[in-house]
A protein has these predicted regions:
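An anion/pyrophosphate-binding glycine-rich loop and adjacent beta-alpha core
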Residues: 121, 127-238, 290, 299-305
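Conserved redox-cofactor binding core of oxidoreductases
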Residues: 2-85, 90-93, 97, 141-144, ...
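Flavin (primarily FAD) binding-site architecture
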Residues: 96-108
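FAD-site-proximal beta/loop scaffold in flavoenzymes
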Residues: 65-83, 88, 231-275, 281
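Glycine- and aromatic-enriched mobile tails/lids
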Residues: 2, 8-28, 164-180, 191-194, ...
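Alpha-helix capping and helix-loop boundary segments enriched in small/acidic/polar residues
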Residues: 36, 86, 105-113, 147-151, ...
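Hydrophobic/aromatic ligand-binding patch that stacks against planar heteroaromatic rings
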Residues: 94, 121, 256
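Thiamine diphosphate
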Residues: 110-123, 129
Length: 427
């Protein structure tokens, strides 16, 4: 395969792929690299990029906004984190591959960079943003004061791990016949219900009944990380909580990754291709990244690329000054994430969504006013995007008068007969 040619060595068992299964799967279908498949794919592809003489990597840069003329994209304004200057990257074709927006929530499995930057920029440029209410909450993020955003892979449950309460009692049989292998939304809601009903800080995932040598070999990364925190997963259950994990919505694209803005493409989690529906099945995200990246490249290569650019105005920073109140940015960052977790989380209601909308409207105005007055920083850029994305998520959630997939509203607990997309466009 292309990935194997790039150096990804999938785990083998007797000369064949060691396939595993995860939530929502009916059979073993996932090729993996122990318990760090994503890391292996990313590391090897990055090594390939670094060897290419015709590719230049610009590290420590952060996109601010897309360069749009009419309905055509010509690149982006980009913030240099070292010089603190904004420069223009002009291009014939622009591809967004910026990931999702799970950092909108207080608890997430994602890194700090998952602030929905690409989706927010695309929205401001006039792109269709689709189905942003479908945020997937992964059921099992490690719960520990010294662990940040560490995911306990779904493959543990695929290999037989059980979810238990602090007293050791199993509970998934109360929610779904598929038990721990029910889809993520079902498992996350079950855990959330048990925690809120009983006042627990977390539940536990137990695989300690398996052979310890097998556990260490099959899950070396999880075993090591938990061990550094004093948790021996071979003899003790793992404390876990649900956390925001994946953005199923995003920039609407066709099968070639083209958005409704000419020369602007989106691939990976930033995009809404439609393949995940209202609830992504485990491990399909890596497949989507590879398939649509290749489709995007083919589409660009078969079309002619011109050599004429419009005149791009330089970034104007003459009317702003350095801020002496960065505490405002820090405070609003935390406030947005708490609002999203408390009012727009795993279980929603119209009252909570309207309350979130009201609060976010005020914060959005405050951030935009701040943005117009002061010199931009990377934190301010990400806060601006975070607030914009949070508003879009709430607006999308309020527009859906049903419960479907990852969106569960207590006021509309049933699913409508006919599926539809929620589409948000800048007015």
């Amino acid at each position: 395969s292309d990935l194997e040619k790039a150096g990804v060595n999938f785990s083998q068992e007797r000369g064949n792929y060691d396939l595993t299964m995860e939530g929502g799967h009916s059979s073993k279908r996932v090729a993996h690299v122990a318990d760090k498949t994503g890391q292996s794919v990313q590391t090897n592809l990055l090594a390939q990029v670094q060897q290419k003489q015709n590719i230049t990597l610009f590290e420590h840069y952060l996109a601010v906004d897309l360069l749009i003329d009419g309905n055509t994209c010509h690149g982006a304004y980009v913030f240099d984190k070292k010089s603190h200057q904004v420069i223009s990257f002009v291009s014939h074709k622009t591809i967004l591959a910026t990931g999702g927006a799970s950092k909108s929530y207080l608890y997430t499995s994602n890194p700090d960079t998952s602030t929905g930057d690409g989706i927010a920029m695309a929205f401001r440029a006039g792109c269709e943003i689709v189905n942003m209410e479908f945020t997937q909450f992964h059921p099992t993020c490690l719960f520990h004061p010294h662990a940040k955003s560490f995911l306990i892979s779904e493959t543990l449950r695929g290999e037989g791990a059980k979810l238990i309460l602090p007293n050791g009692e199993e509970f998934m049989h109360n929610y779904d016949d598929r038990l721990e292998l029910a889809p993520r939304d079902t498992v996350a809601r079950a855990i959330d219900h048990e925690m809120k009903t009983h006042g627990f800080d977390c539940v536990y995932l137990d695989i300690s009944f398996k052979d310890s040598k097998w556990i260490s070999k099959r899950f070396p990364n999880i075993t090591e990380r938990c061990s550094t925190l004093g948790i021996d997963i071979c003899s003790k259950p793992i404390p876990v909580v649900p956390a925001a994990h994946y953005t199923c919505g995003g920039v609407n694209t066709d099968l070639s990754a083209q958005s409704n803005i000419d020369n602007l493409y989106a691939i990976g989690e930033v995009a809404h291709t439609g393949v995940h529906g209202a609830n992504r099945i485990a491990s399909n995200s890596l497949l989507e990244c590879i398939v649509f990246a290749k489709s995007c490249a083919k589409n660009i290569n078969k079309n002619s690329i011109g050599n004429i650019f419009p005149t791009i105005n330089a970034w104007d920073a003459s009317r702003v000054e350095p801020s002496k109140e960065m505490v405002v940015v820090t405070h609003l960052w935390h406030e947005v994430r708490r609002i999203m977790w408390n009012f727009v989380g795993i279980v929603r209601s119209d009252n909570r969504l309207k309350s979130a909308s009201h609060r976010l409207q005020k914060i959005h105005k405050e951030v935009n006013d701040y943005y117009q007055l002061y010199t931009i920083t990377d934190d301010l850029i990400e806060l601006r995007n975070l607030v914009q994305i949070s508003k879009i998520i709430v607006e999308s959630a309020l527009s859906r008068k049903e419960s479907r997939g990852l969106h569960f509203n207590q006021d509309y607990p049933k699913q409508l007969d006919k599926a539809h997309n929620s589409v948000i466009i800048k007015s």
